[in-house]
Amino acid sequence: MKINQYIDHTLLKPESRQDQIDKLIREAKTYNFASVCINPTWVSYAAKALEGTDIKVCTVIGFPLGATTSAVKAFETKDAISHGADEVDMVINIGQAKSGHFAFVEEDIRAVVEASGDKLVKVIIETCLLTDKEKIKACQAAVAAGADFVKTSTGFSTAGARLDDVRLMRQTVGPDVGVKAAGGTRSLEDAQAFIEAGATRIGTSAGVTIMEGKQTNSGY
């Protein structure tokens, strides 16, 4: 199991400085992580810095609340891709999901999928705010809309990934759609447990710590 290729090396704090983005990129190159996951303002910078490598540039859409309109999410997606994004992690409309409006949720996801062209779309359902029934319906909406992945969490709400949620999401989407566990991966053991539960990608700011076999108290 090559853990490094599961990791989206993540820095999404609003106060992130350029020197911190530089460090993230250096670490991603050192460990050959799957991607760096950064806010849209840093996409073009990271894309230039990662030219000639296999490391993807991942960014976030409708983040972290998911409450912008579908048109805005689609525009954000096109803009991010035009600046060099390879993957987009979008947040569903959580309020509409809580209202039981899953046709709306599906169309919102589809707007981003259609705007993404051939780029990878991961759908953040924010598991900590949903019931199990809502998690299942949100995952089904993501699959129906043509998304490539479902993802547990933004890292900006009340909790991150849980093993039970990853298992439920994997069971719901089947073998052909990815599952990303984000938030709460603080050690190599955590990462291995999420992978065994069905995760095919790990979103974490603790990638280096994980690779060194240590543990951190970092929140994301």
From Swiss-Prot:
InterPro entries, alphabetized: Aldolase_TIM, DeoC, DeoC/FbaB/LacD_aldolase, DeoC_typeI
EC number: 4.1.2.4
Domain of life, per lineage: Bacteria
Record localization: Cytoplasm
Gene Ontology cellular-component annotations: cytoplasm
EC category: lyase
Catalytic function, reaction form: 2-deoxy-D-ribose 5-phosphate = D-glyceraldehyde 3-phosphate + acetaldehyde
Keywords: Cytoplasm, Lyase, Schiff base
Pathway(s) of this molecule: Carbohydrate degradation; 2-deoxy-D-ribose 1-phosphate degradation; D-glyceraldehyde 3-phosphate and acetaldehyde from 2-deoxy-alpha-D-ribose 1-phosphate: step 2/2
Protein's GO biological process: 2-deoxyribose 1-phosphate catabolic process; carbohydrate catabolic process; deoxyribonucleotide catabolic process
Record-level Gene Ontology MF annotations: deoxyribose-phosphate aldolase activity
Pfam family membership, one: DeoC
Catalytic residues in the record: 89 (proton donor/acceptor), 151 (schiff-base intermediate with acetaldehyde), 180 (proton donor/acceptor)
Function text: Catalyzes a reversible aldol reaction between acetaldehyde and D-glyceraldehyde 3-phosphate to generate 2-deoxy-D-ribose 5-phosphate.
Family that this chain belongs to: Belongs to the DeoC/FbaB aldolase family. DeoC type 1 subfamily.
Cross-referenced PANTHER family: DEOXYRIBOSE-PHOSPHATE ALDOLASE
Name recorded for this polypeptide: Deoxyribose-phosphate aldolase
Gene this chain is encoded by: deoC
